[in-house]
Amino acid sequence: MQASSLAAVSSASPSAPARRWTVEEVLGLYDMPLMDLIWRAQGVHRENFDPNAIQRSTLLSVKTGGCSEDCSYCSQSARYDTDTERERLMPLDQVVAAAKAAKDKGASRFCMGAAWKGPKDNDLDRVLDMVREVKALGMQTCVTLGMLKDGQAEKLKDAGLDYYNHNLDTDKEFYGQVIKSHTHDDRLDTLDQVRDAGINVCSGGIIGMGESRKNRAALIVQLANLPKPPESVPINNLVPIPGTPLADNPRLDPFEFVRTIAAARIAMPTSWVRLSAGRQEMSDELQAMCFLAGANSMFYGDFLLTTGNPDIERDDALFARLGVKAI
């Protein structure tokens, strides 16, 4: 299935208003016996998607390091002493070459990320050229550029952008414990601008930052209860980066991660639920459980911005073992 078929799946999603969820209801999902929760999530998944198809996206850092923000998990913050080297915005020809290589390896969506609080107008103009050139390859396009100013989302839409990623990261209650340089409401404002411009929203969170199960449930509720749920929901498993405040965070129970995938699938039945950062540390068996719980998208390629990802050969072998197809 190519990009046009992906669009057909999305456009075929029910247009009826999504139900409103409460934190107590999502906590009730988390509290179910794991096998019952996965069974329910798989049923919801099968009603809306091909259960044996996984969408593959590639993520490229087009501007690395030197970010002014203080996100406690991030290796690209200028406030922390990490191994990430600051790099300027990547030349257009290098971005296009990377997109072509990703397409040749089976990716249908190409995501471009830049480490800054938000794009300056002259930098945005260069990103617009990247979007146009990648779009011309027949790939879906996505960017993650931080917070947007008035009018910038419309420019991205005019360039042909399909998705804008801006994660909520965690719920409003826990947010101030991991980020202080901007607010949870700032992120919601950018999502509103993206939605108003007619761009598909990609927004999810990071699990394992020290938040409680209630915080995780509240994040899912916040996403599901947006005026329109995100079309794409990346779920990241924290990768502790040396030099960041979360470097020594204990690992999350893998089954809790599966529960989060399942709860997200049930609460957002027509969204693409993506396995994102942290997959390199997951066993094939854990990833298979996540697919069974409703994940149907993944990042494909050796790196996600600055963290590792399973190599392509491992992913291809996993798909063959599971009998699933890439789209």
Swiss-Prot record:
Keywords: 2Fe-2S, 4Fe-4S, Biotin biosynthesis, Iron, Iron-sulfur, Metal-binding, S-adenosyl-L-methionine, Transferase. It is an enzyme of class 2 (transferase). [2Fe-2S] cluster binds at C111, C142, C202, R274. Its cofactor is [4Fe-4S] cluster; [2Fe-2S] cluster. Disulfide bonds: none annotated. Binds 1 [4Fe-4S] cluster. The cluster is coordinated with 3 cysteines and an exchangeable S-adenosyl-L-methionine. It comes from the Bacteria. Pathway: Cofactor biosynthesis; biotin biosynthesis; biotin from 7,8-diaminononanoate: step 2/2. Residues 52-279 form the Radical SAM core domain. [4Fe-4S] cluster binds at C67, C71, C74. CDD domains: Radical_SAM. GO terms for biological process: biotin biosynthetic process. It catalyses: (4R,5S)-dethiobiotin + (sulfur carrier)-SH + 2 reduced [2Fe-2S]-[ferredoxin] + 2 S-adenosyl-L-methionine = (sulfur carrier)-H + biotin + 2 5'-deoxyadenosine + 2 L-methionine + 2 oxidized [2Fe-2S]-[ferredoxin]. One of its GO terms (molecular function) is 2 iron, 2 sulfur cluster binding. Its EC number is 2.8.1.6. Belongs to the radical SAM superfamily. Biotin synthase family. Catalyzes the conversion of dethiobiotin (DTB) to biotin by the insertion of a sulfur atom into dethiobiotin via a radical-based mechanism. Homodimer. HAMAP family: BioB. PANTHER family: BIOTIN SYNTHASE, BIOTIN SYNTHASE, MITOCHONDRIAL. This is Biotin synthase. It comes from Dechloromonas aromatica (strain RCB).
